[in-house]
Each structure stands twice: as structure tokens, then as C-alpha cells.
């Protein structure tokens, strides 16, 4: 018997800086319910799904900065999303800004979680490949201060059993790094999912702007194919606080084929029928890691 499921992506349109978490959760609940009505077993939501993409601003007030982070998950405002997921029997992946205090020291991470059908958190990932810069740069029309507001993740690239599937996570820039995909592929991930907030304009290299969508889809398709895994990417998209964010949220098959793609720059749900056993086609006949890999020649990747 093949293992079948319906996988969904819940793309978010812009979130205004003034928009409250309560308002955002209502939007997420609508997409969760819509996905479940289409028979989805699991839905992927974007990076930093509860707020606007705040690293585009330079904050000097720590209290204002802290207001964008979650200190518990789920907190009272977010809990209805978990309760509705349990009621509908649909799992989800979702990103948020995490603030923890350890030894009296604040630690901030760009975090993603996996939630199963009963509404329980079964996996956590903290973004490792942080893009952007740490100090204010006046020439930019908007900042990209992830290196200032987050520290690199400390959980590696784990793979979790979520209901019937083995799942791993990326967050935004991670999808561009083949090392992230390969670690999860070696750990047997059948679905690799995550969210992104990707500006269509990159101030340091504006000559690449016309390639933004191409590079996004190239990363997703190559990562899926080279690791024999399904993948799903959920974007926060459209004109958000004078910054245009890339659309093209997608679901990709282990063959590298795009099987679902958003067409709008607003809240949108896409779904695809997923056969998890198709991962074996690639892993047994093309990318058979045990049979063909030669790790003794790859040492330089980890040394430099």
C-alpha cells in the first residue's frame, strides 16, 4: 500500500507593521480551514508568520524589538490555531521569532516548528544560514538585519516523524544551501518544508533582481531532486511596508517537478497529492547514497 497524503501551502499576503497578532491568526485560521476542506493532512506557513518582516528596520528601543518575538509557543493569542488544527486533524509548519532567556541572557532565534494532527509540537528548527548584515547601512532603501536580531540556530538540521511522514525544515535562505538539504536527505527526510520572506530587490546586487524567482525555484527543484524528497515553500508575499516580497510559493516532487505554484501576491492556499513512496524512486535508482556517495572526498566542505 502506498503512503498518500495531501500537502498544502498557505501563502500570506503582506502583514502591515500595525497589524496585530490577533488579526494575523484569523488569516491563518482561514487558510488552515480552507486546506482541511480540500482534504489536506498538513499545511506549510511562512517564515515569521505572525508579524511583518521586522529586520527591515533598525531598532534602538529593545522593548520595541522584543515585541516582535514570542516567549512561549503557543501563547494565548496563537493557541486557537493549534486547537483548530487538532479539531480538523491537520498538522502544520510555521515560523516565528523566538525569544528565550538562558542564564539571565536573552537569546533570539528565527524559528520554525512542526505540529502534528493532534495539535502538538513535535519538532523545532532554528535558522542557521542568516543573510543580510549586522549594522545599519544608510544606502539601503530597507535594512536586512537578521544578523543583528537573531543568532545562528543551534539545533542542526533534524528530521522528525510527523504523523506518517519524515519531515525536515528550512527557513528562507537555508533553501539556497545544498548542505542543508543533504543533511536532511541523509537523515531520510521525505518532506522538506519551510517559509520565506524574500525581497525582489537585493540592494548589494540589483543586477540579480530579475532572477529572484528563478533562483528561488531553482533551489527548491534542485534540492528536492538531488535528495529524492518532496518539498514545500510558503512565502510572505506582495508589497509589505514599501518592500516587494517574492511570490511563487510552491510544492515540488522528488523528481524536481513543480506540482503546485501560487499565482497571486496575497493569502492563497495550494495543495498537491503526495505519494511519499516516490522518494524511493530517486533514492534507490539515482541518488542511492549508500551505494554511490564517496564521503572521503568531501572533507573540504566541512573544513572551510
Curated annotation (Swiss-Prot):
Residues 5-276 form the CN hydrolase domain. Keywords: Hydrolase. Optimum temperature is 60 degrees Celsius. Very thermostable as still has 98% of its activity after incubation for 30 minutes at 50 degrees Celsius. The keyword Mitochondrion does not apply. The active site is at 47, 127, 172. Its EC number is 3.5.1.77. The activity decreases with increasing concentration of H(2)O(2). Has 68% and 43% of activity remaining upon treatment with 0.1 and 0.2 mM H(2)O(2) for 30 minutes, respectively. Inhibited significantly by 2 mM Zn(2+), Cu(2+) and Ag(+), moderately by Co(2+), Mn(2+), Sn(2+) and Mg(2+), and only slightly by Ba(2+). Slightly activated by Fe(2+) and Ca(2+). No effect on activity by metal chelators EDTA and 8-hydroxyquinoline at 2 mM or by dithiothreitol, 2-mercaptoethanol or phenylmethanesulfonyl fluoride. Has potential for industrial application in the enzymatic production of D-amino acids, which are very valuable intermediates for the production of semisynthetic antibiotics, peptide hormones, and pesticides. InterPro entries: Aliph_Amidase/BUP, C-N_Hydrolase, C-N_Hydrolase_sf. Optimum pH is 7.0. Stable at pH 6.5-8.2. Catalyzes the hydrolysis of N-carbamoyl-D-amino acids to the corresponding D-amino acids. Hydrolyzes aromatic and aliphatic N-carbamoyl-D-amino acids in vitro. Effectively hydrolyzes N-carbamoyl-D-p-hydroxyphenylglycine and N-carbamoyl-DL-p-hydroxyphenylglycine, and to a lesser extent N-carbamoyl-D-methionine. No activity for N-carbamoyl-L-amino acids, N-carbamoyl-beta-alanine or (RS)-alpha-ethyl-N-carbamoylphenylglycine in vitro. Homotetramer. This is N-carbamoyl-D-amino acid hydrolase.
